Amino acid sequence: MATTTGLTEVVLYDTLVNYLISMARLVEGAMNRALDAIVSFESERTASLPGEVFLLEPRINEMEIVIDEHAVRLLRRGSFTEDETRLIVAALKITNDLERIGDIAVNIAERVVSLRDMTQAQTPEELAPMAEAVRSMVSRSLGALIFRNAELAAQVLECDDIVDQYGDRIFEHLLQRMTKDVSRVTPDLQFVLATRHLERIADHATNIAEDIIFWVRGLDVRHGRGLALLPEQQQEDVVVRRTADVTDNSSALYSGVTPSCETQRV
């Protein structure tokens, strides 16, 4: 009987992790479509992507509810090991950040719909590499979740400042452009909002990475605490491939872009 009970508990906790991974894949799929759409909003190849993002939102919201209910079911079981407690706490927080990334993907898709009707709209030069840096952060967070890899999660924390720097430079460029040509104010404000959306996705990816480190290592690295306690990166790195639902045109659209925070080896 004890063995059966133990096996049941293992299955329940593995199910929670699998639910998280499933939700993360949906969210990354929505985000990738939104990023492809905003960077190449004029292309006919990306015209259908905003609609696909809108269709994914209810599925993401449903997964949030499923995970919350499953976590509550685990909490009702009573006693937990330290690892199990950290997993439940991290899962509830990660789910919230994933749901917010899904919402932001919808916000970006809405910007794209508006921009496609604006003749003066012109994509800022650094928006593509900024989007790639954000894409990489979310991809690494998903990889860290799948492989329970604290070192990969720590790499995400290092990228947040780079995304903020892109956002600051794009804002300055757009401000100068709007000052010189008032006809660009309406479309450029859409891009200002889009860069803010990207920064928020990066913030949520950072939160997820911090929660994964807490779950795997028991370290609270929020606000820079305890990060020095993480071990150095292993000598021989292994490429982490993105297994998420990436849009087909992503590689073609960005084949010439070298992001500052690209997917690395762990």
Language-model-derived ranges and their functions:
Residues 1-266:
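Cytosolic, long alpha-helical scaffolding segments
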